[in-house]
Each structure stands twice: as structure tokens, then as C-alpha cells.
A protein has these predicted regions:
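N-terminal leader/targeting pre-sequences
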Residues: 2-9, 13-70, 75-185
Length: 185
């Protein structure tokens, strides 16, 4: 095969890969955001801090007043916390990906790793406290890219009553027990 068609084919392929992965966006290290978590009755339950790095977002969560055991922690698509937290909408999912860290399509190398807002479960101790630090590439704190949590209607972080099963189908994570609007810090 002549060299020019191969180069054109590679360029077109790289274009589609870049378009699917959010383009050529370079994150701005050092950007910060924070969400204060509140219960449906307005009690303060904790704080989630977000720090942009060159390769993703570091998330640091500290909570209290939760029921002991596992809880799904998920970024939702709208920055609104109404008394029942339903105004926060669905999971943040700018890539229109299938649900779950262990979705069969993702394990086959097809598509992206679940919803951008899907995070690891947190586990509350017997006294209701929970602390977790983890990293995600599912979203950015930069404004503008498609996978930014700071789009026109913002984003919220929700603590659910039960843990996420991480599977192909969205699991029954129960009621939304805490919500915080994510704001630039």
C-alpha cells in the first residue's frame, strides 16, 4: 500500500479516537472544586473536594451521619439539590456510555468505562463516618470540554443509600441520602 493512503487512514482514525475521548483538551492542573453534602432535612453531612491534575481529578471525601456500610457516590448531571435530590438528574454521562465499571462491552475494549460520574463506592464505619480518596478520568474541572462538570447547568454529587454493583444494569442504589452542588473553589 502506498505511504500517502496509509498516512491518511491513520490521520482519520486518530481524529475519530480524539473526538470520542473528548478531543485534545489538556487539563489545567491545580483547579479546585468543592461540594458540601447535606441530608434531605438540611443537616451538613460532609465535604467532597476535587483537585484537577494533569491526568485526571483527585477526589477527597469526608462524611458523617451515614448508615454503616456501602454507599454509591455518583456525580449527577445537574447542579441542583432539592429536598428529595431528584432535580440532580441522572448520572453524569457526557459520552453516552453504558453503565458500570465491569460492563462486558468495556471489558472487550468497546466504548468507555461506564458513566463519567460513576465513582467507587464509599463505606461508612459503625459510627456513620466515611473517608475516601480516589482518582477519576471520567470528567474535568475545566470549563468548556464536553466532559466538564461545569457545563451550563452544573453538576451535583449524590450519596446513595446502597452501594453500586458496578454491573451492566444500573443497580438499585436506593434513596439519595446526601447531595452537594459542586462549585469551583
Amino acid at each position: 500500500m502506498p505511504l500517502i493512503p496509509v498516512v491518511i487512514l491513520l490521520a482519520v482514525g486518530l481524529f475519530f479516537i480524539a473526538a470520542r475521548s473528548g478531543g485534545t483538551h489538556q487539563p489545567t492542573p491545580g483547579l479546585m472544586a468543592e461540594a458540601t453534602l447535606e441530608s434531605p432535612s438540611g443537616d451538613r453531612l460532609g465535604t467532597v473536594t476535587f483537585r484537577q491534575t494533569a491526568t485526571g481529578v483527585l477526589i477527597m471525601a469526608e462524611m458523617e451521619g451515614l448508615s454503616p456500610g456501602g454507599h454509591a457516590l455518583i456525580v449527577h448531571e445537574v447542579g441542583s439539590c432539592t429536598p428529595d435530590f431528584n432535580a440532580a438528574g441522572d448520572h453524569f454521562n457526557p459520552e453516552d456510555a453504558e453503565h458500570g465499571f465491569i460492563h462486558p462491552a468495556w471489558k472487550r475494549g468497546e466504548g468507555t468505562r461506564g458513566h463519567g460520574g460513576d465513582l467507587p463506592n464509599i463505606y461508612a464505619a459503625s459510627d456513620g463516618s466515611a473517608r475516601a480518596d480516589f482518582f477519576t478520568v471520567g470528567f474535568t474541572l475545566d470549563q468548556g470540554p464536553r466532559h466538564s462538570i461545569f457545563d451550563a447547568d452544573g453538576s451535583a454529587i449524590i450519596v446513595h443509600e446502597k452501594p453500586d454493583a458496578y454491573g451492566e444494569e444500573e443497580s438499585d442504589t436506593g434513596n439519595r441520602v446526601a447531595c452537594g452542588i459542586i462549585r469551583p473553589a
